[in-house]
């Protein structure tokens, strides 16, 4: 079973403490009834994506290729697009962000965006949702506070 030690992990349906993860999309859930409710909404289109992502443990031979891919990405020219470790920590400690992430609708939007094929189109659609815009603004306010004040 996947580790559910994250302090912010809650059941995607009822927001209780989860015990399990959906084998398709990996969202946490706490019981069979919650899984059944989630399963109705869990997209069958997401299954191939998750199967590609779900791989053997990090110790396998394939992970060595993944490690070099990550290293290549980290050494890419897109340094200005990267969030600093301190800002990542600030995101993780934000109570406002945590409370937004408890919303099942926002979680489903993020899962759809993560698993979708046309991310640019999905991002445009998500940015039409006031809840997602509030989430994005909260993240940007934490990561780029000086730009938020200037606007």
From Swiss-Prot:
Main location: cytoplasm
Keyword Aminoacyl-tRNA synthetase part of the UniProt annotation: no
Region listing for Disordered, in residue ranges: 43-81
SUPFAM superfamilies xref list: HIT/MYND zinc finger-like
Keyword Zinc on entry: yes
Binding site for Zn(2+) 2: 22, 25, 38, 42
Protein name: Zinc finger HIT domain-containing protein 3
Organism field: Mus musculus (Mouse)
Gene: Znhit3
